[in-house]
UniProtKB/Swiss-Prot annotation:
Its main location: plastid. Residues 1-21 are annotated as: Disordered. Belongs to the universal ribosomal protein uL16 family. This is Large ribosomal subunit protein uL16c. GO terms for biological process: mitochondrial translation. The gene is rpl16. Part of the 50S ribosomal subunit. One of its GO terms (molecular function) is structural constituent of ribosome.
Length: 137
């Protein structure tokens, strides 16, 4: 699963997801892409689940690019802990995804196979997604 090797700080504020994605919203590498329609946090496990689906379809013929990286730590406290006494320890990592952000790109496989693969990968995501084809960019 994806996670940063080193970070400046162990813990982060939650923040808020306003507006649409300004960067990473166009196809850059592949021919087909999976684009987010809603804002959300996508965990490293969800990214990995989508990657497994796509690599199964792509095989040796094509190439896959993961365009998001989980760089935000999410902290949790032990259940049954009383209020106070600081913030919990980091449990997992998430990628902050705004609407319009490209999640995955693939290249080197047929249109039919690519749309099928991206559709299944979209089911693994916690948000609504859209499949982009080369001429729709």
């Amino acid at each position: 699963m994806l996670s940063p090797k080193k970070t400046k700080y162990r813990k982060q504020h939650r923040g808020r997801m306003k507006g649409k994605a300004q960067r990473g919203n166009k196809i850059a590498y592949g021919g087909f892409a999976l684009q987010a329609i809603q804002p959300c946090w996508i965990t490293s496990r969800q990214i990995e689940a989508g990657r497994r689906v796509l690599t199964r379809f792509v095989r040796r013929g094509g190439k896959l690019w993961i365009r998001i990286f989980p760089d935000k730590p999410i902290t949790m406290r032990a259940s049954g802990t009383r209020m106070g006494s600081g913030k919990g320890s980091p449990q997992y990592w998430v990628a902050v995804v705004k609407p319009g952000r490209i999640l995955y790109e693939i290249k080197g496989i047929s249109i039919k196979l690519a749309t099928r693969a991206l559709k299944i990968a979209g089911y693994k995501m916690p948000i609504q997604t859209k499949i982009l084809k080369p001429f729709e960019n």
